[in-house]
Amino acid sequence: QFGPGWLGIPEFVLPPLTKVISEAARIWDSERLFWHAGITALEVVIGFVLGSILGALIGYALGVSPRVEAVLSPYLLALQIAPKVAFAPLFVMWLGYTMYPKILVAILIVFFPVLINVLSAMRAMDHDMINLARSFSATRMQVFSMVEYPTTLPALFSGLRIASTLAVIGVVVGELVGGNIGLGYMLVFFEGQGNTAAVFVVIALLPDRDRGEK
């Protein structure tokens, strides 16, 4: 609160806490802050759910079928090493200033942590357990449902935990690049106005990535 004034720090660099609080009250009503936060949350949830489902399904498919892995691995590797957020402007050009580009960026970012964790767990599977199940005449689906799937659940949840934080990053970056709704758009909007206090308010609404990874 008093640090910026005592240290001679300009308010546009570090505004006092009272100004941030008053600005939060103002934009809560006049700028529909709650609505923009809801849009960002919806994009994060949709991107996280769809990206996680795709990553898990393809991860299990690659783990179960070496042939599928041999066919898809080169394409997945090329996509994995590409910077995912760089696709945001392209998605905006294709789909316009809607929710869809942000959701696609989130899906792309979420997809790989889940895929890699699941596939790594499938590769590290104890084959003695699989052979034991087969010795009891278990079908391929039974082996997967009773042995492989339960064994890989810790890795799956670990991937989901990482992906949940990355989904927020993907959506906000998409909104920063080409958005007219959401918290990322609000950051750009208030930055253009030189309203540092409002920027701090929006940042405070974003999930804490470090806290989510603990």
Where are these regions (language model features)?
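Periplasmic/extracellular loop-to-transmembrane helix junction in inner-membrane transport proteins
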Residues: 6-49
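Hydrophobic alpha-helical elements at and bordering transmembrane segments
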Residues: 24, 33, 37, 41, ...
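Hydrophobic alpha-helical transmembrane segments of multipass integral membrane proteins
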Residues: 34, 38, 42-62, 153, ...
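Loop-to-helix entry region at the N-terminal start of transmembrane alpha-helices
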Residues: 35-43, 93-114, 157, 198-203
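Cytoplasmic-entry segments and transmembrane alpha-helices of multi-pass inner-membrane transporters
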Residues: 56-93, 103-106, 116-123, 131
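Transmembrane alpha-helices
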Residues: 104, 108, 141-174, 204-208
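Short cytoplasmic-facing helical segments at TM-TM junctions of multi-pass membrane proteins
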Residues: 117-162, 183, 187
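Hydrophobic alpha-helical transmembrane segments of polytopic membrane proteins
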Residues: 184-214
